[in-house]
């Protein structure tokens, strides 16, 4: 008697290609782009050029957009990059420029995915959007803090997520706090960027300051979790990726 036909078992799809990286600068936007094919890197660069030009044009029409630290009313005809920045800033209660780097990262990765990428990372000065078909370790740079060389393991996923970092002791970005690193995790990368800014602003010095800093973002829909490093103290809230050791050096950072 013949054996019944068996349904073929689909083998898990292997990640394709060895990742390549490219450093790309367009005026103040300085990014590191990672993908498995150069065409995806070009897609990211094209998106950055396009959305940055749109943003610059909008700022010329309303310079207040660039300088306000307060929530901003969204015009009906605002372009997508501007809308995302406004929505993120308003959700957190701060200005739209708090979300500029994360928004550009997200739009670039979206363009890479549209081109077919399953592995795509854009690091815009510590504000990172990614989609990955293999585990990825993202290092957290914490300046002179004794808590260093920490990495976060992002397991394979088929949708874009983000980790954005703010610091008061590292880098040129505006921060009113004393965090060596304040990182926020969200699938809304614009929101993660604005939230990291607010979290970093809230961090003072000492253990108690780290503990109470999370009030700046706790309870905001869309935020998965956060991590703060300040001096010899580290605090975590919410759902975080697995923490591991990583080789985190200053020269590895995409400086914006």
Curated annotation (Swiss-Prot):
InterPro entries: ApbE-like_sf (IPR003374), MA1715-like (IPR037456), UPF0280 (IPR007183). Gene3D superfamilies: ApbE-like domains. Signal peptide: none annotated. SUPFAM superfamilies: ApbE-like. Belongs to the UPF0280 family. This is UPF0280 protein MM_2648.
């Amino acid at each position: 008697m013949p054996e019944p036909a068996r349904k073929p078992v689909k083998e898990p799809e292997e990640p394709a290609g060895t990742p390549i990286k490219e450093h790309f600068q367009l005026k103040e936007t300085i990014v590191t782009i990672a993908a498995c094919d150069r065409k995806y890197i070009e897609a990211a660069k094209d998106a950055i050029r396009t959305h940055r030009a749109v943003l610059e044009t909008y700022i010329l029409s309303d310079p207040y957009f660039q300088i306000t630290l307060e929530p901003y009313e969204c015009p009906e005809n605002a372009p997508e990059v501007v809308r995302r920045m406004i929505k993120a800033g308003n959700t957190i209660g701060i200005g739209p420029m708090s979300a500029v780097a994360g928004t550009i990262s997200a739009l670039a990765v979206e363009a890479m995915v549209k081109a077919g990428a399953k592995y795509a990372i854009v690091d815009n000065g510590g504000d990172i959007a990614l989609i990955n078909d293999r585990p990825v370790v993202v290092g957290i740079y914490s300046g002179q803090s004794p808590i260093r060389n920490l990495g976060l393991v992002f397991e394979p996923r088929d949708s874009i997520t983000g980790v954005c970092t703010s610091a008061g002791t590292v880098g040129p970005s505006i921060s009113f706090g004393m965090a060596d690193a304040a990182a926020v995790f969200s699938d809304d990368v614009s929101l993660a960027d604005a939230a990291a800014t607010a979290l970093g602003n809230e961090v003072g010095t000492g253990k108690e300051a780290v503990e109470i800093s999370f009030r700046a973002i706790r309870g905001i829909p869309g935020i998965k979790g956060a991590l703060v490093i300040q001096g010899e103290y580290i605090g975590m809230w919410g759902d975080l990726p697995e923490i591991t050791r990583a080789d985190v050096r200053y020269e590895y950072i995409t400086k914006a």
